Amino acid sequence: MSTVATYSYTHSVTYVTDNILKSLKDIILLSGLDPEHFADRWESNTRAIKTWLGTGDLRKVILEIYNPATDKLVTRWDIDIVYGWSDGDGSFWTDTEQLKYAIKKAGLLPSQAKYKLMLDTKPGRPDVEGWSKGSYRSTDGMVKQSLGSTVEHSGLAGQAGYWRQR
């Protein structure tokens, strides 16, 4: 039984990792931003998310979109991780339509905007090559719009939301 449960959790981690990254790629593309930087770091992003999901240390995936001239946040997308995994029925889904609707609602971003992927992890998490500590840009004057669950596999889930100006 533990072999089956281990395989299933590994499958959940892979599914959730892949679909979080696909969702972020959609956000970047549909917001009118250049996906080249994101594509160039795909392997590193996959390795970090998969590692920290697997150890239970990943708390949040954050895509900061900022004005490079002022270094101020334009918008921010958060995917909060929910660890409610069970080896039950193996249900899985990704709500791409909900995400596309929210991206459309948030609107196109200035073409000069840049983005940065950040991962919020628990203290004591294992190191992943290419990743280090960082700090977030301020969300002062912004309000978060929650979308709810956008990806789930057997209870391991990502709940998306975005920050907009008040």
UniProtKB/Swiss-Prot annotation:
**Any one GO BP annotation for this protein:** defense response to virus
Q: Record keywords: Nucleotide-binding included?
A: no
A single Pfam family it belongs to is: bacHORMA_2
Cite the effect that the entry attributes to D95K.
No longer binds to CdnD
From which domain of life does this come? Answer: Bacteria
UniProt key word Nucleus: no
Keywords from UniProt, A to Z, are: Antiviral defense
List the residue ranges of the region (Required to bind CdnD). Answer: 134-166
Query: What's the entry's take on its domains?
Result: Can adopt both open and closed states. Full-length closed state protein binds a closure peptide (consensus Glu-Val-Met-Glu-Phe-Asn-Pro). In the Cap7:Cap8 complex only Cap7 binds a closure peptide.
Question: How does this chain assemble?
Answer: Interacts individually with CdnD and Cap8 (also called HORMA3); forms CdnD:Cap7:Cap8 (also called CdnD:HORMA2:HORMA3) complexes with stoichiometries of 1:1:1 and 2:1:1.
Give the protein's biological function. Sensor protein of a CBASS antivirus system. CBASS (cyclic oligonucleotide-based antiphage signaling system) provides immunity against bacteriophage. The CD-NTase protein synthesizes cyclic nucleotides in response to infection; these serve as specific second messenger signals. The signals activate a diverse range of effectors, leading to bacterial cell death and thus abortive phage infection. A type III-C(AAA) CBASS system.
Query: What is stated as this protein's family in its record?
Result: Belongs to the bacterial HORMA family. HORMA2 subfamily.
The protein's name: CD-NTase-associated protein 7
Please name the source species: Pseudomonas aeruginosa
